[in-house]
Every structure is written in structure tokens, then in C-alpha cells.
Amino acid sequence: MTKHIAILRGDGIGPEIVAETVRVLDKFIAQGLDADYEYAPLGGEAYDEYGHPYPEFTQNLCRKADAVLLGAVGSPQYDNLDRPLRPERGLLAIRKDLNLFANLRPAVLYPELANASTLKPEIVAGLDILIVRELTGDIYFGEPRGIRVLENGEHEGYNTMKYSESEIRRIAHVAFQSAQKRSKKVCSVGKANVLETTELWREIFEEIGKQYPDVELSHMYVDNAAMQLVRAPKQFDVIATGNIFGDILSDEASMLTGSIGMLPSASLDENGKGLYEPSHGSAPDIAGQNKANPLATILSLAMLLRYSLNDEARAQQVENSVQKVLQQGLRTGDIYEEGTKLVSCSEMGDAVLAAL
């Protein structure tokens, strides 16, 4: 049965990195992958065309699709729009609309990039962490929220942090099942000493953990976890955490690898449908200059093949091809160092295709 993929180019470098990734997808389709794809706008591109960052056309296409591939959203030119109309709101809206509750962000350090990390090679060599972040709850979506005027005339901003038992249960299962395929360790991260939300989180993880006796469960406060990621990151296998803590920790973990331009991500629903995107932003400063690193987006396609199309063989083919071009010494500007060859976005795409 043909799988349908919605492709959202987005803003900034989004169209460039997506173009290189689609070339890989086209090659697989030509070789017999039973899939097709259609483009739709999201973010600033969608606002320009439809007046909304997540328009009805895009909603309908994404709801019908088996998987969604996204470039990046956001650009300073939209900063003065009302908050609900800004490009980033399109990303929040699609996650909520498709009920993409589980965000998987690998932080893997390729041996060829060991010197690109800001940490000493002996601390990060062989790093392979997976951060499992809950995406649709927590303080980003909690109500009530807003800015109000107090009786004394002072303005006050307020937000609501909350998690239901069912929300925690389903993300816990994703974390434990992910760990079973890896090194069988889950570290649950929160702030249970001061936040009731994460106190409940810890209790539920303890309960669910009993269903996975082969997986070792530990707990860590988020401030300590942030420190340990820099001090001794290889102690971690799967880190499971809520929306706001996961947002921060996954960006921190990404820099252990030397470049956020290397890191893919998957956001999944309960049935394996997913949104796949690079972990980096839209980099408007280099947009349209053929300088962007397409590898995180190409690796996001590998995750799409693995999780939504159940095609492990092609997923590994993509990952092996990326490793091969790194072994050949090819580098975009973000991962370039002396002794390697600086290439453009499209040249990196050429190299991955050749390696396939």
C-alpha cells in the first residue's frame, strides 16, 4: 500500500535542505519504495500565502499523510506579527493537531566529528544519547495563561504547568521501549523536589518501569542533568523528560556532538505517524546561499523510513551514506575544520546520493 508523505519546506534554509533530502527520497522511489509525496506550506511561507502559519490546506494534507517531512520554520521578518500568527506557532499547531506527543532526538557523535565538539574527545567519543521529550503537555500548552493587570496596576505574566496521568504513561512506554532497543537505561528527568507535576511524573515512571524489568530506571533533577550532560554525558542512554525541560536539554545535548546541523528528530503519535525535522532552526543568516548543512534533514528522512514506513534497511542505508561522506572528509561550514574539504549544501547532497 502506497505511503503518503507531506513535505513542508518552511522558512530560511528550509527549502534548500529539503530539496537535497527529496533527491534521496526520489532515488528510493525510483528503486521501488512504495511512497509518494506532496508539498504544503508551513510557518512564514504559509503566512505569506494564506495569512496563517498552519492553514487549512496544510492541515488537511498532513492529517491524510502517513508521515510529514519538515525543513525549518521562523524568520525575524515575522517577529512583529501577533503571537498566534508567527511561524513558530505553525509548528506548535501541527504537533497539537496531529497529536504528536513523543519527540525523539538522538545526540550521536560521529567519530569523524570528535574534534568539532566543544568538549574533550575522551569525554564525548562514542556518545549516543536519545532524548525522549513529551511534546503536547506541560507549561507550553497549560491553561490558564496570559498577562493580566493586578489590583495595584502592575502587570503579571502567568502560565500553568500540568501533566495528566495518561500523558505521562504513554511517554513512559515510548521511553522504555526505545531503551529496550538500545543500552537498556532510562533516566527520568524532572524537578520532583519542588514541582508536583514532576513528582507525579516520577511516580508513574516507577510504576511503568516494573513492566520493563530489563530496563534500568534512574531519576535525576533537571539542574543536575544539565550539569551531567557536560561533565559525563556517556552515562546516559535514554533521557525521558517533559516538554520545557526536554526543549532545553535536547538543545544542550545537540552541542555535545559538535553541530546541531547533524541532528535529526522525530515527533510521533500513538500509531507511528510522525513529523520528521532537523533539530536546528531556519538559519535566516545563511538562507539562499547554498551554505546550509542538509545532513540533519537527510537523517530525519532515515528516521521517517524507520518509524513511519517500517523500512529499517533503507533507514540504515541513509545513515551509512552520511557516515561515508564524513569519512571522505566532506564538510559544510558548520562542521568544517582544517584538513577537511568545504562543500556547499548541494555538493553535500550530491555526495550522499553518490554514497547511496
Curated annotation (Swiss-Prot):
Pathway this chain belongs to: Amino-acid biosynthesis; L-leucine biosynthesis; L-leucine from 3-methyl-2-oxobutanoate: step 3/4
EC number annotated for this UniProt entry: 1.1.1.85
Top-tier EC class: oxidoreductase
InterPro entries xref list: IsoCit/isopropylmalate_DH_CS (IPR019818), IsoPropMal-DH-like_dom (IPR024084), Isopropylmalate_DH (IPR004429)
GO biological process terms on file: L-leucine biosynthetic process
Cross-referenced SMART domains: Iso_dh
Cross-referenced Pfam families: Iso_dh (PF00180)
UniProt-listed NCBIfam families: leuB
Entry function: Catalyzes the oxidation of 3-carboxy-2-hydroxy-4-methylpentanoate (3-isopropylmalate) to 3-carboxy-4-methyl-2-oxopentanoate. The product decarboxylates to 4-methyl-2 oxopentanoate.
Family designation: Belongs to the isocitrate and isopropylmalate dehydrogenases family. LeuB type 1 subfamily.
Protein name: 3-isopropylmalate dehydrogenase
Organism: Neisseria gonorrhoeae (strain ATCC 700825 / FA 1090)
